[in-house]
Amino acid sequence: MEERNLDLEARNEDIRDKFHTNVVRFELDQIMQHFDEAIQTINAQFVVADELIESGKVNEGENIWRAQIIFLASALDFYMHELTKYGLCEIYNENWDRTDKYENLKVNMKVIEVALKSGEDIDWFLEYINNYYRAITMISYESVKDQFKLLGINLAHIADRAFYQREGTERTKDKFKRRLN
């Protein structure tokens, strides 16, 4: 019987042109609208989960609840990424105050070359932000806190608006942290 050759062939790499898409920058009201729509979709599934559980399909209802947690985290992550993109562009355009974290962003030479060739065009900056933050998940307290600091957003103010309760004993920042973690 003839022996088969099971050696692996070297594979060609980097032979296709990279796919390039234009980075979209939403306005604040659009970012909020997308977030609100995601929350409404998540809330609508509570009715479905409740109906399943009431009809004896407990596992199916609980699966919807688990999926809602993932969808909620995804909605927050999208919101934070878009807020970051929006805020950094506002800082870049000098509409918002610069922050220490903004001034210390790491930019490699390839990005600088593109920026210099782009003139007044801001697309290079949007692409840089998108590439820099795309692998970072922004759903933990620490990541949200870091993004707020980068953008000059007062975390205590946000926590107070979201979680203040008259005669409450827990600090609003601690509640904020507990909810995200």
Identify the function of each model-found stretch.
Residues M1-I70, E82, G87, E94-N95, ...:
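Charged alpha-helical initiation segments
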Residues N43, L76-D77:
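Structural signal for well-ordered, non-membrane alpha-helices
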Residues F71-L72, Y79, T84-N181:
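Helix-loop junctions and short alpha-helical segments
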